Regions:
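Solvent-exposed interaction surfaces and binding hotspots enriched for charged
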Residues: 1-106
């Protein structure tokens, strides 16, 4: 049975209900969800503080963090990069399959 992580985001007056398909070797989906939520909330906080940051600069910042994390992990860097690319692709598919509901005045 595939592990799925229910997740909700609010973006531009839309409530988006998602179900992320997790990697088969995911050890604890609750922790994955909590860490993802904390990271998203922290990014939102940073975006408010640095309101002039571009999407490109934000993505570059995230790439630096991910590259650093991959480098210090005990796994083969190339395999980790391939896994990361696949997880991103799968995550985008899951987001595109999310259920969108308008919030407030539509």
């Amino acid at each position: 049975m595939k592990k799925k992580l229910p997740f909700t985001i609010i973006h531009k007056n839309n409530n988006i209900d998602l179900f992320f398909n997790l990697h088969p070797e995911t050890k604890d989906k609750e922790i994955v969800g909590k860490v993802a939520e904390e990271l998203i909330n922290n990014i939102d906080k940073q975006l408010k503080e640095y309101s002039t940051i571009s999407d490109g600069d934000l993505i570059q910042s995230l790439a630096i963090v991910i590259a650093t994390r991959i480098h210090i992990s005990p796994f083969d860097n190339t395999k980790m990069i391939n896994l990361m690319n696949q997880l991103i692709k799968n995550g985008l598919v899951d987001i595109n399959n999310g259920k969108i509901s308008k919030i407030g005045m539509a």
